[in-house]
């Protein structure tokens, strides 16, 4: 059992609260079942393939991309494949999604460059990320505008 907080000892296990491979695989199986009803077949032989552009000019970004790929593919047991798309310089990486005019111009399935995000207690800092017409800090990177 994972304890988020141990009040008696004033400590936590320091676990990644969003990382739950068993739950991820269970959710994927549910999606596979539902998609099969629409004629969509997902399996190890016919996996979901997601493109992730990453900046290969720095080891930290390369390592992060490889770790994400390994984590997703192991947890989802080969039914999802992460295709790492190497961007030799930061400009190429930014133009894959961050510098696009709209979400429809983006060239990725997964992307980790979103610009500024919420980082303080004012509610506007969270709401401003999703402003309409592409004005939100993150709306464009999510492909919403």
What are these regions (language model features)?
Residues 72-79, 115, 134:
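A generic secondary-structure signal for well-formed alpha-helical elements
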Residues 43-46, 101-106, 121:
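Extracellular/periplasmic catalytic domains that process cell-envelope and extracellular macromolecules
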Residues 53-57, 85-87, 113-117:
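Active-site-proximal beta-strand/loop segments in catalytic clefts of secreted hydrolases
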Residues 46-49, 76-81, 105-110:
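Loop/turn elements at helix/coil->beta-strand transitions in domains of secreted/extracellular proteins
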């Amino acid at each position: 059992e994972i304890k988020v907080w141990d009040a008696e000892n004033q400590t936590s296990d320091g676990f990644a609260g969003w990382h739950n491979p068993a739950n991820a695989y269970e959710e994927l199986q549910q999606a596979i079942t539902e998609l099969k009803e629409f004629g969509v077949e997902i399996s190890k032989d016919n996996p979901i393939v997601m493109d992730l552009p990453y900046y290969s000019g720095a080891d930290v970004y390369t390592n992060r991309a490889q770790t994400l790929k390994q984590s997703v593919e192991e947890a989802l047991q080969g039914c999802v494949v992460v295709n790492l798309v190497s961007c030799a310089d930061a400009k190429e990486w930014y133009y894959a999604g961050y510098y696009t005019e709209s979400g429809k111009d983006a060239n990725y399935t997964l992307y980790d460059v979103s610009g500024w995000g919420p980082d303080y207690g004012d509610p506007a800092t969270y709401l401003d990320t999703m402003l309409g017409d592409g004005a939100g800090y993150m709306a464009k990177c999510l492909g919403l505008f």
